[in-house]
Amino acid sequence: MGFNQSISVTKKIDVNKNKLWEFISSPGYLNYCHPFCKKNKIIKWEKDNHSDILEYLNGVVYIRNFIKWDENKGYTLLIGEKNKEQSKVIWEIIENGSSNYLKITVFPYFLKNYPKVISYIPYKLFVTPKLRIYLKSVLNGIKFYLINEVPIQRNKYGRHSWFS
């Protein structure tokens, strides 16, 4: 499964690493922090087998299958509609001195079978800006929830044309 492009966004999260990991590794956590999530339902949440369903506000339903789980550091998952193309997503906790950061990197399935020279312009003009806005909203939602311990309002950081 080769991917031509990736988009990463990193956000400083003002909580200790254990609290951050405990939250992002807990079942159903997107229900509390994801600004475009209508429902986050668990399929399986066991030691070496994690998968869930993410239903967006606009009714799009994605399945997340976790393919790598690195305790207290992060995980890698595949996400997409059932029986369709999937994007690869890496969630990483980064420690830098006394600060903790959460980094999300998405390797979108869009145009992945095209040569980079052909997919470059659509990515730069369309996919990258949309995904960057999406990832910033997700990370802001996680930070908001962990600091305030109050579930986030839907579309808190603005509507998103792909998911609202």
Locate the predicted segments by residue.
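Hydrophobic ligand-binding cavity/cleft-lining segments
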Residues: 1-44, 163-164
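Short, surface-exposed coil-to-beta transition loops
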Residues: 6-8, 59-64, 85-90
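Hydrophobic pocket/interface hotspot
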Residues: 19-24, 30, 66, 77, ...
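Short beta-strand segments that buttress and anchor functional surface loops
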Residues: 50-57, 76-82
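Helix-adjacent hinge/juxtasegments
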Residues: 62-69, 75-85
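Beta-strand/loop substructures that line and gate deep hydrophobic ligand-binding cavities in soluble
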Residues: 81-137, 144, 148, 153-155
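Charge-rich (especially acidic), low-complexity segments
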Residues: 152-164
